[in-house]
A protein has these predicted regions:
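Residue-level detector of flexible, active-site-proximal loop/helix-junction positions
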Residues: 38, 62, 84
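Alpha-helical scaffold segments in soluble metabolic enzymes
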Residues: 17-20, 45-46, 65, 86, ...
Length: 99
């Protein structure tokens, strides 16, 4: 069974390193959530690459841009860390912090 993972700060250098490790072992891991502060373009590209359905963007301007940029797709984009209370307890085995 795949381990479900959330990566906080996935667009940082540490976050990108974590994604590279997971990419090499996709059969054992499924990413359920990615977060970023302002870098919504990288975040959305990561979501496409790893088939992630839940994203959190903490910067309001970036959140609005991301919603317009990715309108109509099957990805849920949340605007702050409060949404983690809803997503994390139900969906993930591990939370990796790269903030």
């Amino acid at each position: 069974m795949k381990k479900k993972i959330a990566i906080l700060g996935s667009t940082s250098s540490i976050g990108k390193s974590l994604l590279n490790i997971i990419k090499k072992d996709k059969k054992n891991f499924k990413i359920e959530l990615l977060t970023a502060n302002t870098n919504y373009k990288d975040l959305i590209n990561q979501a496409k690459q790893f088939n992630v359905k839940n994203l959190v963007i903490t910067d309001l301007k970036s959140f609005i841009k991301s919603k317009n940029f990715y309108k109509g797709k099957k990805i849920k984009i949340f605007k702050n860390f409060d949404s983690l209370k809803i997503i994390l307890p139900k969906k993930v085995d591990y939370v990796m912090s790269a903030i």
